[in-house]
Amino acid sequence: MLSKLDQNGHISTIPRLDRDHPMFYWIFKNMDFTQWSSAKCSRVLWLSGPLECNIPQVSSYIVSQEKNAALNTEHLVLYFFCSAATKTRSVAANFTHTLLNQIVCSSPMDKRILIIRRFLYSLIEGISNKETSLSREERVLNEKGLPDISIQSIILNAPPKELFTALEAVLGDEEQRCLSVIIDGLDKVSYQQSEFIREVRAFVEYLQQRTSKIKILLTSRPLAEIKDLFDGLPCIEHDRERKGPSVS
């Protein structure tokens, strides 16, 4: 029922990165990236560069590093490559459903159905409050705790705001877990890009209120409309970055 995307399959198509290659010095030898990578407190970073910078390779590498560091811990690693969703109009649904699936898969078996129910209850409540035309029967879950067929299409086509709110409700129950979030290629979103990125910005601001440690990495090309929406976020932009002492 959920429109999740195979992120690991997509990552497997991205060429592996040579961290020591000079073309990536602007990131890996940058003081802002070093602070983000090694931070003991919450950090947000936006990487911005043209296509030839091969930023998806960097994102793929960081996802792998974060997942390896999270082994045998409660640390939660969530990631989404927008380029995997270029053929669909429902990127907000793809995004929230994919991250929900990652949360479920990283949780104990006895908690998984509770997480899914939490997401669905929050989503249905949000839609019900917005769509007053829904009948009482349409708002009721069946005996298995899953939506009736009559509301499944509503869930799959829910507005972005309600989808993000439902995802936040799930993460609110995971408050004590440290969290890494990597969202790559926001410029690749072709349908309702501004609306989606605006929701991502609000999502980032929500996560920054968490008491546990968070690391958030966002990437895109340096497009003017994205710059406007991400104004104020810490950023490394290609050829405009601050350089550490190890970079000439």
Question: Could you tell me what each predicted segment is?
Answer:
Residues 1-248:
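Conserved NB-ARC/NACHT P-loop NTPase core of NLR-like innate immune receptors
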